[in-house]
Amino acid sequence: MFKCWSVVLVLGFIFLESEGRPTKEGGYGLKSYQPLMRLRHKQEKNQESSRVKGFMIQDGPFGSCENKYCGLGRHCVTSRETGQAECACMDLCKRHYKPVCGSDGEFYENHCEVHRAACLKKQKITIVHNEDCFFKGDKCKTTEYSKMKNMLLDLQNQKYIMQENENPNGDDISRKKLLVDQMFKYFDADSNGLVDINELTQVIKQEELGKDLFDCTLYVLLKYDDFNADKHLALEEFYRAFQVIQLSLPEDQKLSITAATVGQSAVLSCAIQGTLRPPIIWKRNNIILNNLDLEDINDFGDDGSLYITKVTTTHVGNYTCYADGYEQVYQTHIFQVNVPPVIRVYPESQAREPGVTASLRCHAEGIPKPQLGWLKNGIDITPKLSKQLTLQANGSEVHISNVRYEDTGAYTCIAKNEAGVDEDISSLFVEDSARKTLANILWREEGLGIGNMFYVFYEDGIKVIQPIECEFQRHIKPSEKLLGFQDEVCPKAEGDEVQRCVWASAVNVKDKFIYVAQPTLDRVLIVDVQSQKVVQAVSTDPVPVKLHYDKSHDQVWVLSWGTLEKTSPTLQVITLASGNVPHHTIHTQPVGKQFDRVDDFFIPTTTLIITHMRFGFILHKDEAALQKIDLETMSYIKTINLKDYKCVPQSLAYTHLGGYYFIGCKPDSTGAVSPQVMVDGVTDSVIGFNSDVTGTPYVSPDGHYLVSINDVKGLVRVQYITIRGEIQEAFDIYTNLHISDLAFQPSFTEAHQYNIYGSSSTQTDVLFVELSSGKVKMIKSLKEPLKAEEWPWNRKNRQIQDSGLFGQYLMTPSKDSLFILDGRLNKLNCEITEVEKGNTVIWVGDA
């Protein structure tokens, strides 16, 4: 090759001497030494040979290109019009990649392209010896740049397969890192740990990448990813360019436990670190939180922290964080919410004669479970414990046998946990009842007075029953008139020989009023507890069947069917329910402008530590969805779709420990029942199935026990929910009782524990289960219940009613009797006969 160039060089000098200068058409102001410049720039061979041939061959036709030299970037063409030889800009240059910058600031793939551009632009363009133009211009768009990098990875992958005869092992991220490491090693020709522009040029030549990179070149790597602008690419910058993100999470921080007190704010920080760490994504119950518009979780911060503005017990649970796109490296945060103790004592005061037994009980709720202690007149009673003075049920009860005058005092129960302290006083007076003293004024035999009574609504009116001695305190007859009105409690219906009452649902409103539905009279009666009289009738839509008292907003919700066939059900609300004012109903906002689809509704009940509920749900007939409602505005908020789980909701229960809703589903057309579906109250998202647990869910007042009744399988399943919202495996109880209703009662032997009582829809027994141990017992011989067809208002044809936080009695009706159970002794206390269809029972009182 060098010999050929030498011949041309010599000939160039010879003919310049003999022929003189080239014509002016040869280029823009070309000098006599232009051939030397041309040869140094390696002018395209066809153009060079044409010029040499034109000088050497003297006898060719004057107008042909044989004798015409056009200069760099141009070539000779014969005009179709004149037939004369003319110079024109070259159509294309031979493919050859040696990039240069032109004085016009543009990037050119080789010298020929510079001269061709000078011809086309009719301007002088020289070579500029720097690389600034390599990084200018916008031909290489972001999308094209990404495509180029993907293509480079594909090429490297193919190389690896050819060299190793196998695919790279590991996950996508590990494989990508391996390929980028190998690519960098190949690019870094001098192995100095840096890739410069010359090495990129060398790769372009070796791999012939000049025209195949989507309007991009390898130089764009320096333009976009030279992080420190030193015109070199280090391995870390290569990682950045190809998004090989190396994340780190210390082993001891993979699991983080955070506790906050209810009502405060909380910040969960993600410990995942790494250069170019992508944005942090947070999940709860596998639902991404970043994309949700949540009131209480609405700021993720520049550092990716999760910020909870006002902590509640619904926020309890596990949160995971990871860098976007790198979910395999994640940190788990166990978030626990502590709640200060709330105490109730019973009784607040009592008087006892010397020689009898006195009991002072304390119930405390909080998270974690509070520790209990007692003071007498400000002094710890622990050193004074004896056979006569004992602590029972894990310290929740002070038991004094054979009381003496010196036992008189103020007994203070103190509850403590990590979040705070609470206390309350129970006063004991010991003296002769015949003496007219303060103690005599405060005298209150347990079970006497207007409180601590069962109210039973049956065919012959309303009976008020004291459970200890099973005594009637009051009988409100059907013919009794409403206080101040002429209306009767149960007017005689046409065709009836005997004046009878028909009742459905009833609710206790702050131990002040009882609201009770009369479905055949299209109204709700209000019973005043103080006077034990019916004081008002509130008209409703036809056939009111279900009432619920929303204590948070002091309103009673009323579900009416419209007809006995449930053809036009509606929801109404009675506001200011505990007020001494005339009451009336207002309609809720229809969901989808349709009232006639309402099948049921659910509003969680408040507890000692959870005193406010904001939301409820409406269930539509045969619809696999929940309609969320705002209890304050009584308006629709959103729909939670359950179609993916093929669940038409039939029953709901709620625990504040994590804010979970448990949904019992209706059987399908074949009678099969799908497992319960769980919904997260924080995100309103479906979490999934509650394992394989089926049936009607019930949750204990403290939120810790979920009891599910599957009547088809005769199965009772008990699950425990921890203070961290973890749902533990169930234990099973098989029974053929066909459970109708369930009641929870605080344990008399263990603090912070509950027992359940289940009534039977077909049999004469009641099921007892000690939830902490799984101990089971039957209380027998309670007579047959009402037949299901005799109680059309709901599925609970045999109700069972507890007697409050400290009460030891429960009541359950049979077809024509009432049975009072003693929960402390786990036995039947008494039977009250001649009470027909008394399946609406309410407890009023402290205990």
Curated annotation (Swiss-Prot):
The keyword Secreted applies. Residues 250-337, 341-426 form the Ig-like domain. Its main location: secreted. Residues 175-210, 211-246 form the EF-hand domain. GO terms for cellular component: extracellular region. GO terms for biological process: cell differentiation; regulation of BMP signaling pathway. GO terms for molecular function: calcium ion binding. It is found in: Secreted. The keyword Zinc does not apply. InterPro entries: EF-hand-dom_pair, EF_Hand_1_Ca_BS, EF_hand_dom, Ig-like_dom, Ig-like_dom_sf, Ig-like_fold, Ig_sub, Ig_sub2. Ca(2+) 1 binds at D188, D190, N192, E199. Glycans are attached at N318, N394. Ca(2+) 2 binds at D226, N228, D230, H232, E237. This is Follistatin-related protein 5.
